[in-house]
Amino acid sequence: MSKSTLQDGAIYDAKTLGAGRVVVLGFQHMFAMFGSTVLVPALTGLSVSATLLFAGLGTLLFHLLSKRKVPAFLGSSFAFLAGYFALAPNGERELLPYACFGVALAGLVYLLLAGLIKLFGANRVMKFFPPIVTGPIIIAIGLCLSATAINSCSTNWIVAIVAILIIIVCNIWGKGMIKIIPILLGVVGAYVLCIILTATPASSLVDLNAALAGTEGYVPNMVHCIGGNANFQLFTQASIDNIKNAAWIGLPFQYNDTVFSIFTNGKADSGLLITAVATIVPISLATIVEHIGDISAISSTVGSNFIKDPGLHRTLMGDGLATTLASLFGAPANTTYGENTGVLTLSKVFDPMVVRLAAVFAIVFSFSPKLAACISAIPTPVVGGISLVLYGMISAVGVRNVVENKIDFGKARNVIIAAIILVLSIGIAYSAAGAIVIPINASITISLSGLAVGSLVGIILNAVLPGKDYVFEEDAKDAPAKKDGKKK
């Protein structure tokens, strides 16, 4: 592989890079998804190791069902958080399997839609998703995630900026392999900086929960900070202790955490089962819309029509089965990950084999609590700096989608659709509630994210407003031929 190919061209056959470089690229994809993937179990009380195991297995299953053509990684979905909180508000271990039961059924909704698309064709579905809808949705995906990145960066802007600068320098001025692994280098560089700072006298422990000392339920949150300043956080003491205490080998999940345990202990609560279904299954309608947006983003990034080949029905089937499988064994719902789409955009290595390698790494790490703890210990500002770039890249892909499809913003309908999608998606995401909450009865509510609401309203507006001129061409001309691993 010539240097010019590494620097300028999109790479479709990673084997031409050599085994060593492919391994490094696989690690880059794993590091990119890790922060968000382990955050979901941290918030809900689910197993981190089980999450990694079924993120890896789910990704491999997705690739198998999508004919190994789509370079997507499946990680933990944030869309179902409201469902987990509704069933197990305090992460009660005995209640989480009920929430997982609801999520498992939500995954089956994907399969139902996949069957309908296979039966009636993608045209009838994709006519509701023209570029004027998918473009703003993709833009909104990145912008809705941006607050998480900024909040993480704010724990130590110095470290976050170092991570960002490493990515920029490597991606713009890097040569050869350095240019295509900027995310990995950003993680490693900022991680090493945090290790050095933590080991020096400049760092001291600070209890971020000190204001709650003496109150009921008080738990210290000790964090190593530069100069004892909470605005310059490094490693948490808990993460360091986890590394020290974690075993090298361990099983990723326990039977009592699985959905099967509900029906084998003879104490299944039918009321909780019904609540789980009514609360969580409707969320799948929103996540399906997000799935189509993600696949559109990956298609735009890679330059291939994945809606046509391998087909939307296959990607939905892969996502749905991965979600159901993960949930049955007590892991969070899976979803195609925007972070990894950002990695594709930066590295320009589009070979799905690299993503599958990342999935294998995730599976291996799931059986080693020690290795998982080392990755989980990545300081929050490092994750923030990396995420800031990746989320921005997602939105940039949306902008490119709009530009390349030559959307006419001289038409009032196009302006209205784009405006409503963006304002609803971002506005609701940043509102006090963070979602639209729909009460069903005294004990059941449905929570829709800003992205879900914006997407659904945008789809409806596109369907009812006059002036539609978009025709989805399932047999659109494929991407230019690929040769020697590079698109010509």
Regions flagged by a language model, labelled:
Residues 95-207, 359-475:
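Membrane-embedded alpha-helical modules
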